[in-house]
């Protein structure tokens, strides 16, 4: 029996090579099933296309000696699970459609593929039959597998390439080597990595289009003119090693290897005769101009409010793409979403070209409108809105198809100034930071006082380890290392900083209430995170006033669900005026939302008949238009469970019988308007115009991919007898101008909502 043979694809630096991942299903050990057969013919599987990582790509199947693809009609995550196992991975994390990794060639072997997800082979799934398809290769399906191999499958790094030489990596080398150079490097000689090492590029025929592509690869939105007289003078004094010439880019390429270019032959003795090394100068985006303290370039910042943004990403320059239309933010459908459109987004935001064009809500799902679909960009557009697109209807797309991007970023070196020690894996440990000046650098610890989730978010981002799962104030349970000095305290971050040095902190005068290495800061990072959003329309639809007798509120009083004035009321006579509404809280992230406290510390509440896992999960507030709080919900504790879920998502959590608590990805927890404490006590509120505000996870106790969408606001008018609640929206769903109009709302003059 044949062993498994594997041709594995390259890491990102090589992504734009013409390479394929190929897997032969065999049996190198008893843990792998025998080679799968269809009739008398065996099947082989591989991943193809670019740009991609080794565990993702267009699925190709070899049957009867002929390679072919799979149509995306009726393709699901369950089918992706089966195919990823065929390819030697443990499971799928997503799938793609519309030839995201480029169209294949040859036969389309399978169409309308329908799997349960538990099949041992794709041959056990239903389909139209082998070779029976009405699709084109523009509908080729792809898979994103979990980067974890099945036991027994080889994990080779052999790369199958079409040409011997390819441009794998590009850098800028400053012409002047001495002195302390600030990062990122924005100007210098263009060098490409070839098998024999780094080589320069001949500047004969070099154009601004070439510079534009190089700058985009290196994380910069644009290029600028260079003082070539200076570089020509330097070139005469140095020896150069040229490896590349005749580069001709259109300017829309995401990588230099996609341009027309030629390599010098090994025996060529007249390399770049009469020419000089190519030099490029790039423009910093606004984020990095601020980071380096440089003055912002005019190119870097568009006038007026941005009309595109990224949400839900762990790092700068990645996230779900959202666009502004008619004062409201919405998402982009991933149909025909490609690297060209993604690069337009990245450059518009001040980054370089796109490293990945993400589909299938890889950065979590949005909520609300989907503004664009089938966006087709040439790559030259200054804004995504300049690209042709399709007017979308409700039937066209769902939020499970939200598009995302990962952009090329400038190299800043911030990840070299931080490290973790003592943890069980590279994703956790005690945080150590490097301080000092060159020649006198040392590593030190961070005081754990006030260290929390927001600070951990910045640390995990700086480390390149994704999202923060926990921010730890004590790390005594991890092995202590040689580093014992506390060099940073009082760290306060907003969560958006590029490094801990950008957060407010003490460095010269360390103040730490608890001394010793056991009370230093630590983190646990994660590749995925939850993302909670409140269904704002349901709040608006269900809000009403109830005058509830005091004799029915003893349990609520015990739970501290009433205003403080209730303590002096004439119990059990009288009543409290309550603003009731339903809260439907969705988890649209990529990880389950779990309470911070373990089961051992949950509290039993006799009145409600179940355990509460979080003391503070949501704040309910009534605010004046200027933001002054006049009433609050006092909802003391919560039980988290899956009330309902999206199609094909199963419930995992329930409060009954001391069950596990949480909210599964794709599910929501519903607090109905008629349950105890689902209200705000407005007995003491005077008639007027107010803002109803609901904030989920207000103390950042549990990590999420995005905290900016945790607040919901509504305009409301209370006349002493009735209340009108309208204009409810997630806090960041409106444009800046629409938010200003919301806050200036003058109130109602009649029952008519305007």
From Swiss-Prot:
Disulfide partners: 71-135, 84-145, 115-125, 202-272, 215-282, 249-259, 333-397, 346-407, 377-387, 447-512, 460-525, 493-503, 555-561, 607-655, 639-645, 667-677, 714-728
Tissue localization of expression: Expressed in palate: predominantly present in the palate mesenchyme and tongue (at protein level). In spine, expressed in the original intervertebral disk, cartilage primordia, anterior and posterior longitudinal ligaments, meninges of spinal cord, lung and heart. In eyes, strongly expressed in the skin of the eyelid and weakly expressed in the cornea and sclera. In lung, predominantly expressed in the pulmonary mesenchyme. In developing muscle, expressed at myofiber ends (at protein level).
Tagged with keyword Repeat: yes
Cross-link (Lysine tyrosylquinone (Lys-Tyr)): 635-671
Cofactor note text: Contains 1 lysine tyrosylquinone.
Disruption phenotype: Perinatal lethality, due to impaired development of the palate shelves and abnormalities in the cartilage primordia of the thoracic vertebrae. Cleft palates and spinal deformities are caused by the decreased collagen cross-links in the palate and spine. In addition, mice display a reduction in the saccular space in the lungs at 18.5 dpc. Lungs also show reduced lung volumes and weights and deformed and smaller thoracic cavities. Excess elastic fibers are detected, possibly due to an increased expression of Loxl4.
PROSITE patterns: LYSYL_OXIDASE, SRCR_1, SRCR_2
Entry EC number(s): 1.4.3.-, 1.4.3.13
SMART domains tied to this protein: SR
Key words, A-Z: Copper, Cytoplasm, Disulfide bond, Glycoprotein, LTQ, Metal-binding, Nucleus, Oxidoreductase, Repeat, Secreted, Signal, TPQ
Domain SRCR: 45-146, 170-283, 308-408, 418-526
Similarity comment text for this entry: Belongs to the lysyl oxidase family.
Name used for this protein in its record: Lysyl oxidase homolog 3
Organism: Mus musculus
Native organism taxonomy: Eukaryota, Metazoa, Chordata, Craniata, Vertebrata
């Amino acid at each position: 029996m044949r062993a498994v043979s594997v041709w594995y694809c390259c890491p990102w630096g090589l992504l734009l090579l013409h390479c394929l991942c190929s897997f032969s299903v065999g049996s190198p050990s008893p843990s792998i099933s025998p080679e799968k057969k269809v009739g008398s013919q065996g099947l082989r599987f591989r991943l193809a296309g670019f740009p991609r990582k080794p565990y993702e790509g267009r699925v190709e199947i070899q049957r009867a000696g002929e390679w072919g693809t799979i149509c995306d009609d009726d393709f699901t995550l369950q089918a992706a699970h089966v195919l990823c196992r065929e390819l030697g991975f443990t499971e799928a994390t997503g799938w793609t459609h519309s030839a995201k990794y480029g169209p294949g060639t040859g036969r389309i072997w399978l169409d309308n593929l329908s799997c349960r997800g538990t099949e041992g082979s794709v041959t056990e799934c239903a389909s139209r039959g082998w070779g029976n398809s009405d699709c084109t290769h523009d509908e080729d399906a792809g898979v994103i597998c979990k980067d974890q191999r099945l036991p027994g499958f080889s994990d080779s790094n052999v790369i199958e390439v079409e040409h011997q030489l390819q441009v794998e990596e590009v850098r800028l080398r400053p012409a002047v080597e001495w002195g302390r150079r600030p990062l990122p490097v924005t100007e210098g000689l263009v060098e490409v990595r070839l098998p024999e090492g780094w080589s320069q590029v001949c500047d004969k025929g070099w154009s601004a289009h070439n510079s534009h592509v190089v700058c985009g690869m290196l994380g910069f939105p644009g290029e600028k003119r260079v003082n070539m007289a200076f570089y020509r003078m330097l070139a005469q004094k140095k020896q150069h090693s040229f490896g590349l010439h005749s580069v001709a880019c259109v300017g829309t390429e995401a990588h230099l290897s996609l341009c027309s270019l030629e390599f010098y032959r090994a025996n060529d003795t007249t390399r770049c005769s009469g020419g000089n090394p190519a030099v490029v100068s790039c423009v910093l985006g606004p984020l990095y101009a601020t980071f380096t303290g440089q003055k912002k370039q005019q190119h870097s910042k568009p006038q007026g409010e941005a009309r595109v943004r990224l949400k839900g990403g762990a790092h700068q320059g990645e996230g779900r793409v959202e666009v502004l239309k008619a004062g409201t933010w919405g998402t982009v459908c991933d149909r025909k979403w490609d690297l060209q459109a993604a690069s337009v987004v990245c450059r518009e935001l001040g980054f370089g070209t796109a490293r990945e064009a993400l589909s299938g809500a890889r950065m979590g799902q949005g909520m609300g409108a989907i503004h664009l679909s089938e966006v087709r960009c040439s790559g030259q557009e200054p804004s995504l809105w300049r690209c042709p697109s399709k007017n979308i209807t409700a039937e066209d797309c769902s939020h499970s198809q939200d598009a995302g991007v990962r952009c090329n970023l400038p190299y800043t070196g911030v990840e070299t100034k931080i490290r973790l020690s003592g943890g069980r894996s590279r994703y956790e440990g005690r945080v150590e930071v490097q301080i000092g000046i060159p020649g006198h650098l040392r590593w030190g610890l961070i005081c754990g006082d006030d260290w929390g989730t927001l600070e951990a978010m910045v640390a995990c981002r700086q480390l390149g380890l994704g999202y923060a799962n926990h921010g730890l104030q004590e790390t005594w349970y991890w092995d202590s290392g040689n580093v014992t000095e506390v060099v940073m305290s009082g760290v306060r971050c907003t969560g958006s900083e590029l490094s801990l040095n950008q957060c407010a902190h003490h460095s010269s005068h360390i103040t730490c209430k608890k001394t010793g290495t056991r009370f230093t800061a630590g983190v646990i990072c994660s590749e995925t995170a939850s993302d909670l959003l409140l269904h704002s329309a349901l709040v608006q639809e269900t809000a009403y006033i109830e005058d509830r007798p005091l004799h029915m509120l003893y349990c609520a009083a015990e739970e501290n669900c009433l205003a403080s004035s209730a303590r002096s009321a004439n119990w059990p006579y009288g009543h409290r005026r309550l603003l009731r509404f339903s809260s439907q809280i969705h988890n649209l992230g990529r990880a389950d939302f779990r309470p911070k406290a373990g089961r051992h510390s949950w509290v039993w509440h006799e009145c409600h008949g179940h355990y509460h896992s979080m003391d503070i999960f949501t704040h309910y507030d009534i605010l004046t238009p200027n933001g002054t709080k006049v009433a609050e919900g006092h909802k003391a504790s919560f039980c988290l469970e899956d009330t309902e879920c999206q199609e094909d998502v199963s419930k995992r959590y329930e409060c009954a019988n001391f069950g596990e608590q949480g909210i599964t990805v794709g599910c929501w927890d519903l607090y109905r308007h008629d349950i105890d404490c689902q209200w705000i006590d407005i007995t003491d509120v005077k008639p007027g115009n107010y803002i109803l505000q609901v904030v989920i996870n207000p103390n950042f106790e549990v990590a999420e991919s995005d905290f900016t969408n945790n607040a919901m606001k509504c305009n409301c008018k209370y006349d002493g007898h009735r209340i009108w609640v309208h204009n409810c929206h997630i806090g960041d769903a409106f444009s800046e101008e629409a938010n200003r109009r919301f806050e200036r709302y003058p109130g109602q003059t009649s029952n008519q909502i305007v």
